[in-house]
UniProtKB/Swiss-Prot annotation:
Keywords: DNA damage, DNA repair, DNA replication, Ligase, NAD. GO terms for molecular function: DNA ligase (NAD+) activity. This is DNA ligase B. It comes from Escherichia coli (strain ATCC 8739 / DSM 1576 / NBRC 3972 / NCIMB 8545 / WDCM 00012 / Crooks). The active site is at 124 (n6-amp-lysine intermediate). Belongs to the NAD-dependent DNA ligase family. LigB subfamily. GO terms for biological process: DNA repair; DNA replication.
Amino acid sequence: MKVWMAILISILCWQSSVWAVCPAWSPARAQEEISRLQQQIKQWDDDYWKEGKSEVEDGVYDQLSARLTQWQRCFGSEPRDVMMPPLNGAVMHPVAHTGVRKMVDKNALSLWMRERSDLWVQPKVDGVAVTLVYRDGKLNKAISRGNGLKGEDWTQKVSLISAVPQTVSGPLANSTLQGEIFLQREGHIQQQMGGINARAKVAGLMMRQDDSDTLNSLGVFVWAWPDGPQLMSDRLKELATAGFTLTQTYTRAVKNADEVARVRNEWWKAELPFVTDGVVVRAAKEPESRHWLPGQAEWLVAWKYQPVAQVAEVKAIQFAVGKSGKISVVASLAPVMLDDKKVQRVNIGSVRRWQEWDIAPGDQILVSLAGQGIPRIDDVVWRGAERTKPTPPENRFNSLTCYFASDVCQEQFISRLVWLGAKQVLGLDGIGEAGWRALHQTHRFEHIFSWLLLTPEQLQNTPGIAKSKSAQLWHQFNLARKQPFTRWVMAMGIPLTRAALNASDERSWSQLLFSTEQFWQQLPGTGSGRARQVIEWKENAQIKKLGSWLAAQQITGFEP
């Protein structure tokens, strides 16, 4: 009873999370958005099932289909049947394809496994499902999954796939098998290579009218033998003897969710002969095949891999001004998980880049992780019906603006504070953008070094700064006073690399002010253009004023 109560609570929590992300649309807009996406998915379905081609990645299709279902539930529409092919000339399956229920996480899988025994894990091979019917030892019929009850006659196509045994003996002589036709791969590593649109490629080969030699690039993984031997070990042995060797190789006994997780992680990183999108856990004990119905399999579940790329809704477009004055565009997202990382923002780049992407709030974008786990945009996969894009700020900033605070300088000023606090500059540990905003909002800094005047009491009474952290910050600010002269010059934004600045051997503000353009041009990695920038920088009125202020604070190198 406790187990079922836990499952019920999990379901309710899942439903709550779905409702929590329902769009704030009027009924009219909801109808328009749902209708547009429904039409697009129907077009993709027609291309997939009638033409054997795919205009969209498998993962994007799956996620947009799930998004459509979510919207339909939010606004009381009838959810569509996913991947429903046309049934013209359909053939009845001897045994229905049940499909497989997906587990949301390891905890849900653990609850499901707790009620069952004699469990086995298999890879969830990514291809197209098929029924193989053997009569009197020969392949009699091959049927596509279709809607689970009826499918297309694929006998001629399957008979040309060399990986599918055309004759069998013993218990398999009169049998019905269910499995996955897949694209054969050599050393496919799912973690690195992803799905490669394998499902669509297989469907394309199976739907073509010509009997191409390319069918030999396909294989089959049998995952069910309805009314077969009771013992899983016997099933696997007979299948392997008949030529279905992959089933025995990739079926393992498991006792709990931890063991499943280990196998799942192993197959995620291992070289496999097929593309996978997760694992399937099944009980050896199955009901008689006459009781099998689509959507009603209680003896098996799937635990899919998290997609390498996720479809995320754009909630807002925001503009940021960097320390150099360049305007960058950031998309605020409905949260998605990527490799155990919660992603809520992604950098689009420059205003021009944003305009080229043509991204607006309400659009659906494909997001993945680039090097060092940084989110990136891979594609815009769906644009909303109503698209209102914000106006970017005027491009009035440059590398010599906003050393002093003003209303128009807010963003660049904060960016300068974040920069000077970085490890490679003044090394102010424990404060980031949010902390700087809190300090500036409360104490209204005059310029980028005004924080040097804050007292312990002021820091302690700053909203947004924990009292336990205020003493640490005051200590960090005091330590900064002892940083080398070159660090302070870097904090002021001198347009030189750290290596060039160190090579200059400048150790005082007065010495730096009297250095010529020719002197700077001789430094490593510093050409004439960069040297002119240094001259413009040191002659700027704001820079001179900051230098004088630091001298008054007796910062090393700035004293008269």
